[in-house]
Amino acid sequence: MHQTQPSLFGKLMTMFAGFALSGAVLAAPAAAPSATPQVEIKTSMGDIVVELDREKAPKSVDNFLAYVKSGFYKGTIFHRVIDGFMIQTGGFDEKLKQKKTNKAIPIESQNGLLNNKYTVAMARTGDPNSATSQFFINVENNDALNYPGRDGFGYTVFGKVIKGEDVVDKIKGVLVDDKGMFQNIPVIPIVIKSATILKTPIPPKQ
């Protein structure tokens, strides 16, 4: 999914176990980062929880979490919605102003994760190594986006929706229009209110 450009898509705790030795307190090593962190994305149409795959897409996951931790996604909109394809967000505010991003990351599309329905993937320009903050949720199985794709690279999947699939389905069906350089933009803005890492992960579905 092309990244839209201005000119044109339990609880984590640090535990310290120490003991006094000659007046010094020794701390236990911090817990390793979760291999499957979960992020709750609260939108104006409902809440979505995504589970990330750090093992298969480490750079993409760490990049996404950095934006989440900084509060970057608050106030961004779903600026491209195509029923039968995907819903895209993470780059523009309600005034359609593009937000300043961090450095682009390398593509990880050869990780074996597929652009199937309800998976989360990085948006980018024609440059395979141009992904920054924008991401999209596949609303169907999009085989054409898998590596190598039509351009020889495909699109990096780094997670999946594990709660709020109904919200994704509502978003994909909204009325859209073209506005300036934006195509398929919702007529009524769909806004991300917050994106936060869940301290208590949702257990796997039985």
Where are the predicted features?
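Cyclophilin-like peptidyl-prolyl cis-trans isomerases
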Residues: 2-12, 16, 23-206
